[in-house]
Amino acid sequence: METAMCVCSPCCTWQRCCPRLFSCLCCKFIFTSERNCTCFPCPYKDERNCQFCHCTCAENPNCHWCCCSWANDPNCKCCCTASTNLKCYYYESHCCRNVTITFRKGRLRSIVTSSKTALRVGSSDTQMDEPKTMPASSHLVSHLTCPMCNRLRLHSFMLPCNHSLCEKCLRQLQKHAEVTENFFILICPMCSRSHCMPYSHQMHLPENYLRGRLTKRYMQQHGYLKWRFDRSSGPILCQVCRTRRIAYKRCVTCRLNLCNDCLKAFHSDVAMQDHVFVDTSAEDQDEKICIHHPSSRINEYCRSDNQLLCAFCKIAFHNGHDTVSLIDACSERSAALFSAIAKFKAVRYEIDNDLMEFNILKSSFKADKEAKRKEVRNGFLKLRAILQEKEKIIMEQIENLEVSRQKEIEKYVYITTMKVNEMDGLIAYSKEALKETGQVAFLQSAKILVDQIEEGIQNTFRPDPQLRLHSLHCIPLDFAELSNAIHELFPTGPKKACSSGDSLPSQYPIHSEMMIARKVTFSTHSFGNQQIYQRSSSLISFNTANDKGKMGLENYGRAQSAAPAKTTDGLYTYWSATGETQPPQSSNSFHNWYSFNDTSVRTPGPIVIYQTLVYPRAAKVYWTCPTEDVDSFEMEFYELVTTPPNNVRTELCGQIRDILQQNLELHNLTPNTEYLFKVRAINDNGPGQWSDICKVVTPDGRGKNRAKWGLLKNIQSALQKRF
């Protein structure tokens, strides 16, 4: 570190320009040339608010204030943003809040205390390690922050329950933990599980290196300065020379960090041309140190317990377990992670459709509700009008019936009364005739009187039985029955799809299309019963593999692994997978997860080469497995040969059949040579489609091995096109 000189007056030290009262570390960070050092640590701890006024979006922390006179680049103008940053952030220094600094022609004029905040550039509550300025749409930050303090931390440690906490929160838990003899019981704040940890001031928990790397990358992209002040990251020293110079390269073969002089002195021999060199990284060195045996390095992975192992851990705790090398473990976990991502993308497609459907349904509720209310109102108004019309008609019928009935009764009473009066007179006349003593006079009129009485009896009619009924009984109205009929016409409520209260919504179907790659090692000199066909050919020999229309993964539909959802009459539809699938049967095929009809059996679909690991004289290729049944794989690899004048042709190096694994390792390759690989699957119905051409270049003897873990670009593009 060079001598701290004042930027305003280089001829004097910064203490002469700045009063002793304001000789804080922040002022030193501004007024001295130490501001140009990117590894200068922050003068305050993480939990304090003072980070001064650094321009956090600068690639180098040289712009320290809103005034660009502090920047090394006078053309900065507070726009010294990196390509990945979107905004320019400043942080307020709480220790200099009452200081007013004025300048005149680039020289320090005075430093006056004031009751006002002179350096108030940003919010006083802004923390450089709190993700407050992050966009709300960022879902990654929730997995990077500590769940207790909700801050971004470069170093977090994993509990046995797989929850990660920062060191500060772990120390707080340790203070309040219950101590039992030489152990303290640590309770996870996330899942409330108890863990027995040794009572010590050292941290006996593995560090979550993946979260640390992702957090550092996140800070670099979003303008956080905390990653620059990481005290744990220091220079890597040479492990060979005594002067302990800074290491320049690391030899993977020798497992040593070498400076430039030692590299030339000990690795310039021809015998060491196959050694692999990589750049030195403190993160890689710390990650491979066993937490239980600091003197040993991690070199294997236990499949049984899913743990990283060193040589001592394997002998002591994992003897007899299924262990693999780190390279093969990375390959398997990469394939498993890719398969899990593919499964979720298939489920996410259905989830997005469901969410979109419900969002549309939710937004249409208000408009549909008003329309429905209007429809119900108009309907009941019509019903009321009909009832009122019926009431009017019935009332008129009752009135008319009463009037007509009264007329008929009056007519009957009048006619019958007249007839009765007439007959009463005739009867009185007949009674007087019976009193006559003269026979001639009686006999002269007796017959006539009898005939008149009988005729009068015959002409006297009985009343109509309908006249005896009451007028209200003529119009029968059972209002109780009408009310019940009306209630039955209207529905009581919406019908549910599942009437049983015990039934629960089923999960989304999982479309499993990938298998975890298994360990296998092949070489061109140890294939056993397998056949290798050697021949020369040009690019025309595999023109079908370059046919983009045939080889594109998007041209192949997803296998129908389950029946479509059954439609129901209700609002909700659930996936019914019961009875659709069968347990896997034991067979020699790779893939027998789903039951297919005989008509659906076909040749294997396309596969994807998702990972390659290339050495100077060897290469290892990993590929996925299609959804159809597979008996074996077949590979062809070509070498690109350059012939004068600048002509490039392909030469078939080998054709390998009956491969029973999802990876293949080839040896005896030529360094600094370009190779092309393609793979296809074979079953009883014949060979499937060739995969896309995978091009690799073997490095020279002094280069580093080239490997890509995780998803390759062709996997990502195929995944995006497919989903």
Swiss-Prot record:
Keywords attached to this entry: Coiled coil, Metal-binding, Repeat, Zinc, Zinc-finger
CDD domains: FN3 (cd00063), RING-HC_TRIM42_C-III (cd16578)
SMART domains: BBOX, FN3, RING
Record-linked InterPro entries: COS_domain (IPR017903), FN3_dom (IPR003961), FN3_sf (IPR036116), Ig-like_fold (IPR013783), TRIM42_RING-HC (IPR042765), TRIM45/56/19-like (IPR047153), Znf_B-box (IPR000315), Znf_RING (IPR001841)
Chain positions of all zinc fingers (B box-type): 235-280, 285-326
Residues binding Zn(2+), per UniProt: C290, H293, C313, H318
Coiled-coil intervals, chain numbering: 382-412
Signal peptide, first to last residue: none
Annotated ranges, domain COS: 434-492
GO terms of molecular function: zinc ion binding
Gene3D superfamilies tied to this protein: 4.10.830.40, Classic Zinc Finger, Immunoglobulins
Zn-finger (RING-type) residues: 146-192
Sequence ranges assigned to domain Fibronectin type-III in this UniProt record: 603-701
Protein family: Belongs to the TRIM/RBCC family.
Name of this chain's protein: Tripartite motif-containing protein 42
Organism of provenance: Mus musculus (Mouse)
Gene: Trim42
